[in-house]
Structure formats: C-alpha cells, structure tokens
Amino acid sequence: MQIFYISSPDNQKIYVWKLDNHQEKLELMQVVSTDGCAQPTVVHPNQNFLYVGIRPDFKIDTYRISQNGLLTKIQSTKICDSPTYLTINIYGTFIYCVSYNFNCINVIKIDKFGLLCNSIQIIKNMLGCHSANINKDRKVLWAPCLQENTIRLFDIDHLYGTLKPHNPHVINTNMQSGPRHMAFHSTDNYAYVINEYNGVIDVIQYNDSITNLAIIQKINILSNHGLDTKKFWSSDIHITPNNRWLYCADRFCNTISLFEILLNTKKLKFINYIYTEDQPRGFLIDSTGNFLIVAGQKSHFITLYRIHANNGNLSVISRHASGMGPMWISILSKNTIH
C-alpha cells in the first residue's frame, strides 16, 4: 500500500489517497481542511511528517502522519515569503523553502521532533527561483532560476544547513528557456532539467565533485515529435526508480511526454506523448515505478496510470475528482500501512 497526498489550493483541502498496488485501486481516505491555500508539500525522510506550504498568509504547516497514513496538524510556522517548492535534506534536519515570487530560498531548521524552528538563512536575488534539488551525493543544492535562465549551485553545510555558492556557481541555459524543475539519475552523474518557456529538456553531465558540468543534450518535449506547437508551459519532470524512463508534463498542450534514458550515454530518446488532465501542474511516479499519478489544475481531477515496464507507455487505470485546482502530489511508502 502507498499513500498519496494531493493539495488542492482552490478549495483549501488536502486529499489523502491510498493506493492498493495489487488491485490497482485508489481509495480516498481523508480530506483535510487547510487554513489557506495549500500548495507545495513534502514528506519527511522518516515518513512521520508532512510539511505543507500555505498562501496567502505565508506559513508552513506540519502534520503528523499516522501508521495508516492519515494526517493530524501539529504546528503552523510563519514564514516571510510565499512558498513555491519544499525540499528536505536526507537527514531530515533542514527544510529548504523556495519562493518564486520573492526570489529566494529560505533555510529552516527541523528539530528532533519534526517541528520547524526559526529561519536560519535566506538566499535572496534569485530571480524566478522555482525549485530546490539535492543530487545523490547530498552535498550540493541545485536551484533553477526561471527568470534568469540559470541553475544556481550551492554547497550544503550538513551541520548547520546553510548554503554557500558552489564553484562553479551557475549553469547557463538558453535565453528565454526558463529552467523550472529537475530530476537526477540515481546512480550516475546526470541531471535532467525541464524548461518552462521553450519545452526543452537539458541533460547535464557532471563529475563527482560537480566541478565540471556540461549540457550534453537539448531535446524538445513535443514540437519535433509530431505535435506542432510554438508555445510551451512545461511544468514537471520525473524518472522511474530504475532510471529507464523519464516523463515530463506541459500545461499548455495538456500532455505527458515519455523518453527512454539510453543506457550507455544517459541521453534521452523520445518515445511518445499522451494527452492527459487539463493543465497538469504536477505528477509523481510511485516508489515501485509501476504507477504514475497526475493532477489536473483546471480539470480538478487526478488520473492514475500504469507504467508498462517493457516500453514505458502509460495506460489509464482510474480517474477521480480531487478538489479544486489540485497541484502538488507527495507520496508515502511505509511497510506499516495497512
């Protein structure tokens, strides 16, 4: 069993869904009312807490997760910026709150009880900062800045959680590309960046120390593959746990594109695309790599797909209403869920 948490800010709810892996069935377990518009969510590495960014009264709410995945609010922490994206370090000791509108990353300590403490650092002047991503060595945070057409790199102090510019500090993408979200290969030194404005995935190769970085491929998610569009509004990107398939979503075309990650070069080979929910703001691949769930911000529905292991293709399993404007999806995978 797995639990999906889906935030729907337009009706100020979090929907808690249970997935039965064997029966391929989604069941609504709980609907939680939020004090404001719930947007970014992230599960603590110990899987005992869910953190939810709230607007317009800027704060992060902390929920305790029960043994069966249900939520109980235990804390509300005021912050000084509008939360866009939340990331937690692997040790569960610091949360990094990205604000697109305030152009910053807010570093907040997490205590041993899972509660948020005061902000310890704010990195400012990051124009259109849209996500915070930590690669497999856990030492560097990557922050795509959409309005700068850059990806900023920061060294993480694992004791204090603070950030300082890495060397090199910046990866430049094409003008008017708009780097937004990222996914990392889990065993090799490759990163995949979805650009919001031009619908291009940048494939970045780097060495162990992340001192030599190169964009080795730029591949369009749609326009060169049978769908003639000049406008993009690309949103999200994820890789299956076995590093074989990569998916990305576009909100203008309402599509999910599928790529194969080539074994030898780690470059991308386009396979196909499908039409999905209206305005797919967020999607997620489950921990088994067998399922993909997408949230339609304008359709107000979610769709559960099966991922076919042999070719990566998606087939619809079920579709469900999930509030108004569903945006963010987080997953809980615990052996104790029943």
Swiss-Prot record:
Keywords: Carbohydrate metabolism, Glucose metabolism, Hydrolase. It comes from the Bacteria. Pfam families: Lactonase. The keyword Hydrolase applies. The keyword Oxidoreductase does not apply. It catalyses: 6-phospho-D-glucono-1,5-lactone + H2O = 6-phospho-D-gluconate + H(+). It is an enzyme of class 3 (hydrolase). One of its GO terms (cellular component) is cytosol. InterPro entries: 6-phosphogluconolactonase_YbhE (IPR022528), Cycloisomerase_2 (IPR050282), Lactonase_7-beta_prop (IPR019405), N2O_reductase_N (IPR011045), WD40/YVTN_repeat-like_dom_sf (IPR015943). Catalyzes the hydrolysis of 6-phosphogluconolactone to 6-phosphogluconate. Belongs to the cycloisomerase 2 family. This is 6-phosphogluconolactonase.
